Amino acid sequence: MTVEQTPENPGTAARAAAEETVNDILQGAWKARAIHVAVELGVPELLQEGPRTATALAEATGAHEQTLRRLLRLLATVGVFDDLGHDDLFAQNALSAVLLPDPASPVATDARFQAAPWHWRAWEQLTHSVRTGEASFDVANGTSFWQLTHEDPKARELFNRAMGSVSLTEAGQVAAAYDFSGAATAVDIGGGRGSLMAAVLDAFPGLRGTLLERPPVAEEARELLTGRGLADRCEILPGDFFETIPDGADVYLIKHVLHDWDDDDVVRILRRIATAMKPDSRLLVIDNLIDERPAASTLFVDLLLLVLVGGAERSESEFAALLEKSGLRVERSLPCGAGPVRIVEIRRA
């Protein structure tokens, strides 16, 4: 008698393959944590000048020798570091080199951001987010993500570096993709450390800017713009975009900010911007937009936003609905680089 094969009752080989795949997915958290520990200990930097023994690495990092050896042996099996197989030596390879400290590398900065204990605690409470639709960060850490990054300089630095590395790449893409030549003034709302504003001002010498950001980060933006020789063309405005937005600019920019907030807060922000806009002002929303077949990486970021801050990535239709509630409308949407980021040009309705 032949047993019918179904998704619940596959053949033996198919079942074994399915179990192996699921097991590999389940072990993903362990692999990530192992990488984080190697990064925290500074192993990639120590291997930059050549292979070293586990004994030497343990001495340099203050780690337990045998346990560090076990950690590196595991990571070598997934392609991070090379186990040379003789003399207890481990070496750098293409994957581990990506983890070297580099403010321009989204992977290197994100590896350090993800390693933070408060980040891991938030993911432990994912069930809370799925049940309630709210951020789990607050429940896991006893404070909000925004409060933590405001009060804790180390947390703020980890976050700003992670965001800054992404912005370094995207800033030039925005300046290349959108023509600001018809504008005299631009306001960057939640402009971070200033890389976007710097790129736009560099590309369009006739433009003057204002950057609105929370006080601790606003000073970092001032330093960057001063270092780029742009301080005389950009006012730094420390403040809260829920409270105040400068009136009457030709162009307003807001990049990777709206996805940090739930729908009600997005409408609050957009209404505040709409009030500040002139009848002929343009608002550029630069953000990930989910299309019909989004990449897994986009959907992971979507879930990360939920866990950390209760935010979300949105589709064009979802975003358009929020704009309508805010008295705004989409004029057009432009690609920005090869990924899911779009520049959405918006006018008052």
Curated annotation (Swiss-Prot):
This is Mitomycin biosynthesis 6-O-methyltransferase. GO terms for molecular function: methyltransferase activity; O-methyltransferase activity; protein dimerization activity. Disruption phenotype: Cells lacking this gene are unable to produce mitomycins A and B, and accumulate 6-demethylmitomycin A and 6-demethylmitomycin B. Involved in the biosynthesis of the quinone methoxy group present in the mitomycin A and B, which are used as anticancer agents. In vitro, catalyzes the 6-O-methylation of both C9-beta- and C9-alpha-configured 6-hydroxymitomycins via the transfer of the S-methyl group of S-adenosyl-L-methionine (AdoMet) to the 6-demethylmitomycin A and B. It can also use hydroxyquinone as substrate. Its EC number is 2.1.1.316. Completely inhibited by Zn(2+) and Cu(2+). Belongs to the class I-like SAM-binding methyltransferase superfamily. Cation-independent O-methyltransferase family. COMT subfamily. It comes from Streptomyces lavendulae. CDD domains: AdoMet_MTases. GO terms for biological process: methylation; quinone biosynthetic process. The gene is mmcR. Keywords: Methyltransferase, S-adenosyl-L-methionine, Transferase. It catalyses: 6-demethylmitomycin A + S-adenosyl-L-methionine = mitomycin A + S-adenosyl-L-homocysteine; 6-demethylmitomycin B + S-adenosyl-L-methionine = mitomycin B + S-adenosyl-L-homocysteine. InterPro entries: COMT-like, O_MeTrfase_dom, Plant_O-MeTrfase_dimerisation, SAM-dependent_MTases_sf, WH-like_DNA-bd_sf, WH_DNA-bd_sf. PROSITE patterns: SAM_OMT_II. Homodimer. Pfam families: Dimerisation, Methyltransf_2. It is an enzyme of class 2 (transferase). Substrate binds at residue 288. The active site is at residue 259.
